[in-house]
């Protein structure tokens, strides 16, 4: 009986310790952003005929999302979501494949494959791969709401033919 009481008292203090640890974890700030609607709004606007006219197959290059925030963002997942949204809206748009991007980044001496390219390097890279349009995307801000910006750049001239920002909550 005494052994049972000692065990019960120890169990209570142990469960209190678990509860304190759980409440500390619970207070951690996790930020869940909804990129889907922001991307949808930007892509719908970008693909309007007054911004871009696509009548036959066009090759696009979209580099990894640039993260200018103080939070972790799965840049590859967001980049793939942007590609997917564009592909749904227009099946004449094709993207430079990931393995081709990786191979050509190594070829021109870019050692950090997972790093976003600056615009001039991305345009140089696009020209070497016969790409017509380059899409630059970036998320910025220190606090909510964060801003998602997508730019559509005509590779031939380097002109930004479309740019839009949307808030992500």
Swiss-Prot record:
InterPro entries attached to this UniProt entry: LpoB (IPR014094)
One Gene Ontology cellular component annotation held by this UniProt entry: periplasmic side of cell outer membrane
GO biological process, one term: peptidoglycan biosynthetic process
Domain of life: Bacteria
A GO term, aspect molecular function: enzyme regulator activity
Pfam families, alphabetized: LpoB
Protein name: Uncharacterized protein BU358
Organism classification: Bacteria, Pseudomonadati, Pseudomonadota, Gammaproteobacteria, Enterobacterales
């Amino acid at each position: 009986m005494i052994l049972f009481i000692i065990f019960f008292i120890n169990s209570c203090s142990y469960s209190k310790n678990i509860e304190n640890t759980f409440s500390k974890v619970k207070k951690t700030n996790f930020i869940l952003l909804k990129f889907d609607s922001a991307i949808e709004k930007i892509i719908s606007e970008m693909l309007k005929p007054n911004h871009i006219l696509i009548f036959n197959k066009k090759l696009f290059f979209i580099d990894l999302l640039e993260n200018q925030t103080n939070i972790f963002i799965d840049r590859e997942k967001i980049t793939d979501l942007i590609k997917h949204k564009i592909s749904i809206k227009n099946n004449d748009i094709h993207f430079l494949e990931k393995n081709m991007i990786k191979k050509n980044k190594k070829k021109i001496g870019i050692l950090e494959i997972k790093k976003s390219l600056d615009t001039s390097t991305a345009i140089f890279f696009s020209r070497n791969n016969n790409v017509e349009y380059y899409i630059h995307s970036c998320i910025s801000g220190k606090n909510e709401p964060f801003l998602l910006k997508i730019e559509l750049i005509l590779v031939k001239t380097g002109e930004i033919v479309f740019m839009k920002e949307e808030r992500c909550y």
